[in-house]
Amino acid sequence: MDISRAEQRILHHLAQGGRIEITREGKTITEIRCFTRDGWVYPGVDLELFRKLKRKRAIRSSAGKPYRITERGVRSELNNR
């Protein structure tokens, strides 16, 4: 799966325990916020990036909870230690 640097940054925050919360007005998404595991808001998420990650099935929401990373969104890496 080819992903851009911006997508990699977001997926990295999510893999460390972050989440993406959305605010809706009816069916329209009005606001998207990415929270790190420490509770800080990461400003690099917009609607286009959110839709790309959703289309690639890298993130998913279950039971109305915030969006989290899926197994498909996590890529394996060698342990360099």
Curated annotation (Swiss-Prot):
Pfam families tied to this protein: YjhX_toxin
Coiled-coil ranges per UniProt: none
InterPro entries documented for this protein: YjhX_toxin
Family as reported in the entry's similarity comment: Belongs to the UPF0386 family.
Protein name: UPF0386 protein Smed_0945
Originating organism: Sinorhizobium medicae (strain WSM419)
